[in-house]
């Protein structure tokens, strides 16, 4: 695990109950404030509030962010593997990676991905929901295809596109993390992290992969600085914060940027 890296703050802009112009303005302001990573989510309907309220699609939005932004890394937290074929996902990610390069050395896209869970998306858009196990099996298979396709595309990605995987299930999810993830979004408490590290390391031995560069991520929702400090002490280095409009609370962002800066001082 990579513990000697700066703390970064990621903000997940929730693409619901706002107009796209509001999202565009939030992206601009968050980058200007110094946020490190911007995320959206990959759903087709709001997750809370009015279930039929305004909502926007993830990947189209990410391509717009690639062109709009100059510095931040960005991606979905997380992509739903079920909604697009693996090879198409790879090509979309590679294309957005190139769009975001904009004169820099590399692109800034993070390929955050997961197996999917929101059944309404599946039912209304015509995807087979299957079971949690079948969706995880598909994710494992499709990630192999994504990586293989990245090796075939012309032009190739501008860098090894970082793969971010969330979850904590020890039999399937953490094996996928050990095989593919550059960033693990952990969803666990500080006390649980050492055990989960051990599970990932055992799977890494099975997969023959060195995880010394794995970055650990966690969320700040309903947590204070005391919990964030404990997560930091346990090895977390990317902290994510949900952000919803239309009444964006930028004071919350300022608070956590101050905390981040104190850790990096």
Question: Language-model features: where?
Answer:
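Active-site-adjacent structural elements that line small-molecule/cofactor binding pockets in enzymes
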Residues: 1-265
């Amino acid at each position: 695990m990579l513990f000697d890296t700066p703390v970064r703050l990621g903000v997940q802009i929730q693409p619901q109950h706002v107009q796209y112009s509001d999202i565009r303005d939030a992206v601009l302001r968050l980058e200007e404030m110094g946020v490190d990573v911007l995320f959206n989510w990959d759903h087709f309907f709001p997750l809370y509030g009015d279930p039929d309220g305004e909502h926007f699609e993830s990947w189209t939005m990410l391509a717009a962010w690639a062109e709009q932004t100059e510095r931040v890394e960005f991606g979905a937290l997380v992509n739903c593997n079920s909604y697009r074929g693996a090879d198409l996902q790879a090509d979309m990610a590679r294309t957005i990676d190139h769009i975001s390069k904009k004169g820099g050395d590399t692109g800034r896209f993070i390929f955050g991905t997961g197996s999917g869970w929101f059944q309404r998306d599946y039912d209304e858009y015509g995807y087979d929901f299957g079971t949690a196990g079948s969706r995880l099996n598909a994710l494992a298979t499709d990630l192999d295809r994504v990586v293989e396709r990245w090796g075939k595309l012309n032009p190739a990605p501008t860098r090894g596109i970082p793969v971010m995987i969330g979850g904590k299930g020890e039999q399937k999810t953490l094996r996928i993390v050990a095989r593919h993830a550059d960033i693990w979004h952990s969803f666990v408490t500080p006390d649980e992290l050492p055990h989960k590290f051990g599970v990932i390391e055992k799977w890494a031995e099975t997969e023959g992969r060195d995880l010394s560069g794995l970055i650990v991520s966690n969320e700040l929702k309903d947590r204070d600085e005391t919990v964030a400090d404990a997560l930091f002490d346990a090895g977390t280095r990317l902290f994510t914060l949900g952000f919803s409009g239309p009444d964006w609370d930028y004071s919350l962002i300022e608070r956590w940027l101050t905390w981040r800066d104190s850790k990096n001082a």
